């Protein structure tokens, strides 16, 4: 088979549909196709020709291949999905900018991109597939947006360069083997929203400390799996046993510094305590809630954080 025309009624092309069709040189895909899964054209002359034209191969809004990219890459605005395996074993990739038009990232999209050091996932992304960053040994920082509701199986397995991760409170589950063999991981902040964690999610993370609230699922999980747990108190950054103006100052200082690109000066546990609204980041909203909380307590109103956040 040297050429193929996809009929107009087709809306999706499945995983590995034309994998290793070694004679395929021409293909016509109609606009009706809105979903293209992983490895669809891998090992075809057609894909090789497209890679020579542009290392980012995009079809109908889906980035299907970037495996020949090197250095820092910017995905163009308008791309809505990154297909499974799009950057599979792309060892020359060092950085990538993902536009807010992207809503999904497929299985193994960045599998074994060993030179990738940092990635920020925009809050437009609502789903990430299994193995999405598996084997990214050079990855030292990952920002997970609060649009994500689950961390998939094997998502960050063998990311040995990761040391700290904060899970946003939009997430309800962490998949099996999600951080397995990420041997450098020492701190992970898990919010109360997480009620399911795979039994092997943190296998071989021998120096890991799970941070969370007392009585949370995270605490129960840590104890059942022999992982050290550290509780943090909402808003109490200096561990004084109360939330006061000192905690507000530390939070404002952090927000101001981060806004101009400087280090915030807070530890992982302090950041977790400062994130009073559980958004996964510390910002001016947290400062407002802390000031409101302190003001109410200052006039004798013994309100809880739940009551403050409900305002």
Give names to the regions the model predicted.
Residues 197-199, 219-220, 299:
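Extracytoplasmic/secreted cell-surface and envelope-processing proteins
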């Amino acid at each position: 088979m040297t050429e193929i025309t996809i009929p107009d009624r087709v809306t999706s092309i499945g995983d590995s549909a034309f994998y290793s069709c070694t004679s395929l040189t021409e293909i016509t895909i109609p606009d009706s196709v809105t979903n293209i899964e992983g490895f669809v054209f891998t090992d075809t002359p057609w894909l090789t020709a497209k890679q020579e034209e542009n290392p980012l191969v995009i079809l109908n809004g889906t980035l299907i291949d970037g495996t020949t990219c090197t250095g820092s890459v910017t995905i163009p605005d308008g791309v809505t999905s990154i297909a499974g395996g799009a950057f599979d074993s792309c060892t020359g990739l060092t950085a990538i900018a993902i536009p807010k038009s992207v809503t999904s990232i497929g299985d193994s999209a960045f599998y074994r991109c060993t030179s990738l050091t940092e990635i920020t996932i925009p809050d437009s992304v609502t789903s990430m597939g299994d193995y999405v960053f598996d084997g990214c040994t050079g990855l030292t920082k990952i920002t997970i947006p609060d649009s994500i509701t689950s961390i998939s199986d094997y998502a960050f397995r063998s990311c040995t360069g990761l040391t700290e991760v904060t899970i946003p409170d939009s997430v309800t589950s962490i998949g099996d083997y999600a951080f397995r063999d990420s041997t450098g991981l020492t701190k992970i902040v898990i919010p109360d929203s997480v009620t399911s964690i795979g039994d092997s999610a943190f296998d071989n993370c021998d120096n890991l400390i799970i941070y969370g609230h007392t009585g949370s699922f995270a605490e129960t999980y840590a104890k059942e799996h022999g992982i050290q747990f550290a509780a943090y108190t909402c808003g109490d950054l200096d561990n004084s046993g109360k939330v006061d103006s000192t905690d507000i100052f530390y939070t404002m200082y952090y927000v101001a510094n981060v806004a101009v690109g400087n280090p915030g000066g807070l530890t992982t546990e302090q950041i977790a305590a400062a994130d009073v609204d559980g958004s996964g980041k510390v910002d001016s909203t947290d400062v407002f809630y802390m000031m409101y909380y302190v003001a109410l307590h200052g006039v004798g109103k013994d309100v809880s954080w739940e009551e403050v956040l409900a305002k």
